[in-house]
Amino acid sequence: MSKKLTFQEIILTLQQYWNDQGCMLMQAYDNEKGAGTMSPYTFLRAIGPEPWNAAYVEPSRRPADGRYGENPNRLYQHHQFQVVMKPSPSNIQELYLESLEKLGINPLEHDVRFVEDNWENPSTGSAGLGWEVWLDGMEITQFTYFQQVGGLATGPVTAEVTYGLERLASYIQEVDSVYDIEWAPGVKYGEIFLQPEYEHSKYSFEVSDQDMLLENFEKFEKEAGRALELGLVHPAYDYVLKCSHTFNLLDARGAVSVTERAGYIARIRNLARVVAKTFVAERKKLGYPLLDEATRKKLLAEEEE
């Protein structure tokens, strides 16, 4: 690698590359979530028959992973670059390897391995065949072919490529700590994110009001259900995301037992499944507008039979 790309140059390079492959460039979704997969741009769009190709950066919050800014590689919040393509291109792995070349990483000169790691997200009823991508011994990407999302079988199959931007940048810039990553010329990652990392860790582990969080979970769950009764998929899903983040805060605080934990996850999953079913039904009512006309008419005719 000749030039060491800054963090923002890595993002710009990936955006341009996947734009050239036909992906829409979406923006980060404005609700807390634990992974880019939970964005409606993946979760909702991976189900149903309509095509969908999108790429976006997603800040992902995982309260239990916070380490007060003292761990060089483990974070309360990290950034993912998410690519979803439906139907999955037959050459998606080749496209991914080409994206590494655009970042200055020649796969022929490095040990790039696809290590089987089937993916599952119990709280959203989602699963798929997957691989971790290891670059010279470090995981930098999760590769998944969705089989089920929101409890629904997927078809056509969606391919998801999730780059861990901090790990990728650490490798490209040859630094041992994420806080030493150059975000932009002259500005280090730690100068932007070290203080919030410490504060969010302190809040998650020591300060958060458990009673308030428990009460909020109940309210968010109830409101999600109420929105679903009215057929309002997107507001309902926003409250599912709020339930998920609230549960993660409770979990980090040690406020839920092992048995309670399973119960909370099941409650979130049940809501997510209803959201998924309702979304597909609403898209059908709209006539699957993202399908080409011939496919749309054929599919709607088949579903009427």
Swiss-Prot record:
SUPFAM superfamilies, A to Z: Class II aaRS and biotin synthetases (SSF55681)
GO CC, one annotated term: cytosol
Molecular function terms, GO-annotated: ATP binding; catalytic activity, acting on a protein; glycine-tRNA ligase activity; transferase activity
Reaction(s) catalysed by this chain's protein: tRNA(Gly) + glycine + ATP = glycyl-tRNA(Gly) + AMP + diphosphate
Source organism superkingdom: Bacteria
Enzyme class label: ligase
InterPro entries in alphabetical order: aa-tRNA-synth_II/BPL/LPL (IPR045864), Gly-tRNA-synth_heterodimer (IPR006194), Gly-tRNA_ligase_asu (IPR002310)
Compartments in which it is found: Cytoplasm
Principal cellular location given in the protein's record: cytoplasm
Keyword Nucleotide-binding attached: yes
Gene3D superfamilies in UniProt: Bira Bifunctional Protein, Domain 2 (3.30.930.10), Class II aaRS and biotin synthetases, domain 2 (1.20.58.180)
Gene Ontology BP annotations: glycyl-tRNA aminoacylation
NCBIfam families on file: glyQ, PRK09348.1
Description of how the protein assembles with itself and partners: Tetramer of two alpha and two beta subunits.
Name by which UniProt lists this protein: Glycine--tRNA ligase alpha subunit
UniProt organism field: Streptococcus thermophilus (strain ATCC BAA-250 / LMG 18311)
